[in-house]
Amino acid sequence: MREHKRKYDMLAIVGPTASGKTSLAVDVALSVSGAEIISADSRQVYRGMDIGTGKDLDEYVRGGAVVPSHLLDIVDAGEKYNLFEFQRDFLAVYDDVKERAAFPIVCGGSGLYVESVLKGYRLLPVPENPALRESLEEKSLEELTTILSQYKTLHNNTDTDTKKRAIRAIEIEEYYRACPVEERSFPQINCLTVGVDVDREVRRGRITRRLHERLENGMVDEVRALLESGITPEQLIYYGLEYKYLTQYIIGELSYDEMVKGLEIAIHQFAKRQMTWFRGMEKRGVHIHWIDAMLPREQQVEMIKDLLYD
């Protein structure tokens, strides 16, 4: 049986938002003995942030069969979870999965998170730099993005859709310039990386439909409940995208139509940045096997299994 001839230690399934990568990962996991999913999503770690992040725990259930999942709902909303913490938590889960002779499937759209474990870069907690922050505060998001684009290292953050996150990303870059670090002792992971390739216009249509579905299914109420729980508008706006725009709508900074229009544009731009990151991963030496998102699911699963086994 090909179950005994697996060629890889781990499978990574990546793709932009609305590509269907999570449901594909679940279907692959159900057809691979002992498979468990490790989420690589920078926002699905937060409890209570479900609709806005596209986190649907029911998606991990198929006909009564539950696929074990990790790194979902591990941090309280309002806190800030970073790449260093993800690497730490990933290694703990990865070691546990391997010790139990299970098979890890990493799935997510945060290319930075995925690449950080595939390449094994050492990351340290980065302290705040008040002087640098003050010097950057007057710059626009566009100017900050231009500054970020000049850095060549792995540590750039593709989720910089707010000034605060862009400034933090620059702060991290400057810290690593001043305090270079060596690679940490990551396990050597022989990983098969699969990308879900979705046509740009198809992706745009899915994003638009999904946004309106989420708005109809309680996303505004979700954000309102987070605010009522004591989380400040500033804390929610930090997370960007849905939480930024819906918070601005709820506190009266945007009309409903302005919120929907602005958010839709921002999500399209985010998906484009995700794809740019994945293409960059390829240039940095990560081989990604691209699979057409429009193929029948059974065919997608078989293609991945053909790559996974001898």
Predicted features, each with a name:
Residues 1-310:
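Phosphate/pyrophosphate-binding catalytic cores of soluble transferases and nucleic-acid-acting enzymes
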